[in-house]
From Swiss-Prot:
Residues 8-207 form the Glutamine amidotransferase type-1 domain. Keywords: ATP-binding, Glutamine amidotransferase, GMP biosynthesis, Ligase, Nucleotide-binding, Purine biosynthesis. Catalyzes the synthesis of GMP from XMP. NCBIfam families: guaA_Cterm, guaA_Nterm, PRK00074.1. This is GMP synthase [glutamine-hydrolyzing]. ATP binds at residues 235-241. Pfam families: GATase, GMP_synt_C, NAD_synthase. Its EC number is 6.3.5.2. CDD domains: GATase1_GMP_Synthase, GMP_synthase_C. One of its GO terms (cellular component) is cytosol. GO terms for molecular function: ATP binding; GMP synthase activity. It comes from Shewanella sp. (strain MR-7). Homodimer. The gene is guaA. Residues 208-400 form the GMPS ATP-PPase domain.
Length: 525
């Protein structure tokens, strides 16, 4: 088996919102990479031994005092370096070039760059040709400052009308700088540029692919846990489901999955989880029906944050009780993924190389004395989904819309009651079913129904009804940081509303949420 970590790229983060996207793109090309904070030491870089280094973007100005700089060793390590946006500016400044503040000449959004010279980074890449026969590329800019003089040994590779050095290179040292963002889809040929850098310039092999990741994970799991028993809290979500499948392949019946049905799941979800993992895949699952326990704990509580804490606390209590019954278990498995590792540093950058394992379950008792198994901690969410498919998990389960950890506990506004949850489950199932039927489900980023604790007058036949209100919510977003409400067709919304009111006794009115984020959040609580 080839070593999937043999060839690797180091990405240094200066705080850009796009930095994780760079890492995901390099992984998509088939090369392993890690994302570290910019203030890494020479010793840490030497130990990691990257085949190439990417200096990512950031919000600071290179011209400001005490702004972040790449470690000097980056330029003496003998490996290719690619500077993106701020990364290009700090590369230029540190190697003897000059950066000036852009006064009213920043570039934000779509731009077209004109190629001035040949470069390995742009080999055979072209979007259009101008009247002078020069190649043009469509790119995405987001910068105020700009390089005004490039370092000795560099050549200008591309320009725009307001940016004389939109790209630069020193082919001898294999140093490259681009003022635009190749990692975003708006830069049409961005993936080809990153592929040239990782595969051709750095000489990496594309070993990072789902089948190899699975093979590597299983081997590492076997080495880590040996013949010991492992317990896992299986929620039916993407991360814990993929962890369950990896461990099942690695250690079989030595894995015990604890599935806690808190009564706050989607319609028939508990049944589906048990049938898929227990009956179909043959995993060893302990099913805990804890609906009454959760609802009793939530009784009388209307505050969203308090509800979240109660749900988390009760889950931990139940999981702890079940874990103690597994007297031979030596390990606790968790679905920690790479963004969790990065974010646990307490900042957007995250020094992933010095982060210790952490409990993402939310405060499991220290006296459990179990080792931690986190087979997904190197992976982004899209990679987890891809290996889930390779492991045989169904597409519809892996690519479902996000569902909050507290479940319906934060989609029933105010106090949570069984009656409300049952009504909401059925209404939500109708909404999702109709989205699938209309081929709209995969065209929105997230869709769900919210139960409003208010009654409204309705008419049914010759009689009046005085029943509950639900709100439909559907949004379109790229990163869930901002979102637009989805402009679903009126006839579709009418069909969903009619079905919910006619088929569910207890709901008299359906409304549609047309709030964006900001100012609203995606979830109501």
């Amino acid at each position: 088996m080839s070593d999937i970590h043999e060839h690797k790229i180091l990405i240094l983060d200066f705080g850009s919102q796009y930095t994780q996207l760079i890492a995901r793109r390099i992984r998509e090309i088939g090369v392993y990479c890690e994302l570290w904070a910019w203030d890494v030491t020479e010793a840490q870089i030497r130990e990691f031994a990257p085949n190439g280094i990417i200096l990512a973007g950031g919000p600071e100005s290179v011209t400001a005092d005490n702004s972040p700089r790449a470690p000097e060793y980056v330029f003496n390590a003998g490996v290719p370096v690619l500077g993106i946006c701020y990364g290009m500016q700090t590369m230029s400044e540190q190697l003897g070039g000059k950066v000036i503040q852009g006064v009213g000449e920043g570039e934000f959004g779509y731009a077209q760059i004109e190629m001035l010279a040949q470069s390995a980074l742009f080999k055979d890449i072209e979007d259009a040709v101008n009247s002078d026969g020069k190649s043009l590329l469509d790119v995405w800019m987001s910068h105020g400052d700009k390089v005004s003089a490039i370092p000795e040994g560099f050549v200008a590779v591309a320009k725009t009308d307001t940016c004389p050095f939109a790209a630069m290179s020193c082919e001898e040292k294999r140093f490259y700088g681009v003022q635009f963002h190749p990692e975003v889809t708006h830069t049409r040929q961005g993936m080809r540029m990153l592929s040239h850098f990782a595969l051709d310039i750095c000489g990496c092999a594309a070993n990072w692919k789902p089948s190899s990741i699975i093979e590597d994970a299983i081997e590492r799991l076997k080495k880590q846990v040996g013949d010991d028993e492992v317990i896992l809290g299986l929620s039916g979500g993407v991360d814990s489901s993929v962890v369950a499948m990896l461990l099942h392949r690695a250690i079989g019946k030595k894995l015990t999955c604890v599935f806690v049905d808190n009564g706050l799941l989607r319609l028939n979800e508990a049944k589906q989880v048990m049938e898929m993992f227990g009956d179909h895949f043959g995993l060893n699952i302990v099913h805990i029906d804890a609906e009454n326990r959760f609802l009793d704990a939530l009784k009388g509580e209307a505050d969203p944050e308090a509800k979240r804490k109660i749900i988390g606390r009760v889950f931990v209590e139940i999981f702890d009780e079940e874990a103690k019954k597994c007297v031979n278990a030596k390990w606790l498995a968790q679905g920690t993924i790479y963004p969790d590792v990065i974010e646990s540093a307490g900042s957007a950058t995250g020094k992933a190389h010095v982060i210790k394992s952490h409990h993402n379950v939310g405060g499991l008792p220290d006296d459990m004395e179990l080792g931690l198994v986190e087979p997904l901690r190197e992976l982004f969410k899209d990679e987890v989904r891809k290996i889930g498919l390779e492991l045989g998990l169904p597409y519809n389960m892996l690519y479902r819309h996000p569902f909050p950890g507290p479940g319906l506990g934060v989609r029933v506004l105010g106090e949570v009651k069984k009656e409300y949850c049952d009504l909401l489950r059925r209404a939500d199932a109708i909404f999702i079913e109709e989205l699938h039927k209309a081929d709209l489900y995969n065209k929105v980023s997230q869709a769900f129904t919210v139960f409003l604790p208010v009654r409204s007058v309705g008419v049914m036949g010759d009689g009046r009804k005085y029943d509950w209100v639900v709100s439909l919510r559907a949004v379109e977003t790229i990163d869930f940081m901002t979102a637009h409400w989805a402009h679903l067709p009126y006839d579709f919304l009418g069909r969903v509303s009619n079905r919910i009111i006619n088929e569910i006794d207890g709901i008299s009115r359906v409304v549609y949420d047309i709030s964006g984020k900001p100012p609203a959040t995606i979830e109501w609580e």
